[in-house]
Amino acid sequence: MKKALFIILIVTGILSACGDKTKVSSRETDTIALRPCPEFCEDTAFCYIEKQCSFGPRVTGSEAWRQCGDWICGEFERHGCLVEEQRGEVKMWDGTPLNARNITARYNPEEKRRVLLCAHWDSRPWADNDEDERNHHTPVPAANDGASGVAVMLEIARLLHEADSALSYGIDFVCFDAEDMGTPDWAEDGGGAETWCLGSQLWSQKMAGREDKPAYGILFDMVGGYGATFSMEEASVRYAKPLVDRLWKIAGQIGYGHYFPMRDGGGVVDDHLYVNRAGIPCIDIIPYHEYGRSVFGHTWHTLEDTPENIDRKVLKAVGQSVVQLLYNEKRK
């Protein structure tokens, strides 16, 4: 995905070069008491990625998208969730109307207190960051940038369904559509940031003003790439710093601190922005690569975004850290 990094990245780079005072947070000495929790299975999550990719690129409105969406709904239902869909018309960067499909799977649907876990499930229609310009109009396989976030959520839903004890609150797993339909690099003109995250914009418009909003949210975006580490994204810290601090600290305590370094990352246009604007504090687990063709990794918006380039260890680090956070909440 994503879109354009905010000017904060440029400012951070200037400050680092001029003063060698890059802002880095430190883990506090006091520890969080960790409660028992299930094991997140990275192999199962990887299989979920392979399955999504087996349908082909899930470009909004395509047959592969339809089939994969039906499969996602079926998997969440198999794991005991109540599945709901939101369909609505959105407009692409060039004004073309598009029928989007957001999928919500509710764990413990009867519980009033809820937590949001979310990811986008669509594929970018154009591999416009591929080194070969001949591929710039070809859809992206989207193993990492799309399937990985959904896979982590499906695995969490599975282990919650099979767990010996239930959580005392509900979880809304939301799969946002049309996140990656933003203006292609080869377009001569088009909109800006608002051309991205069309599904979450649609969803957030519905959520704004409601009293039954989730207490907080976590967005999974590109959570399976080789070499990925997850810095503290700027808008996440701005809207939900206590949640960022808690998750990063838990990750460090359970052995995944090298995947979740206590350092500031840049800002990014992503689904969590619209969730936050709807009044739900939401953070973004998104990679930050200091070196290479893209800060989002070398497969971003290329035809190399395939299951072969997924690192199960990264899936494990992200999934287990979030599961531990969820189980540290009060349980039945």
What name fits each language-model region?
Residues 59-60, 89-91, 110-111, 121-125, ...:
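Solvent-exposed loop/turn segments at secondary-structure junctions
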Residues 97, 216, 223-332:
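Active-site-adjacent substrate-binding region
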Residues 44-51, 67, 71-78, 148-155, ...:
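Extracytoplasmic/secreted proteins, especially bacterial periplasmic and envelope-associated proteins
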Residues 14-17:
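C-terminal motif of bacterial Sec signal peptides marking the signal peptidase cleavage site
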Residues 23-68, 79, 294-309:
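N-terminal capping segment at the start of a domain
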Residues 50-110:
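A non-catalytic alpha/beta surface segment that caps or lines the substrate-entry region
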Residues 31-39, 54-63, 90-93, 135-147, ...:
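Second-shell loop/turn segments in exported
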Residues 137-242, 267:
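Acidic/histidine-rich catalytic neighborhood of metal-dependent amide-processing enzymes
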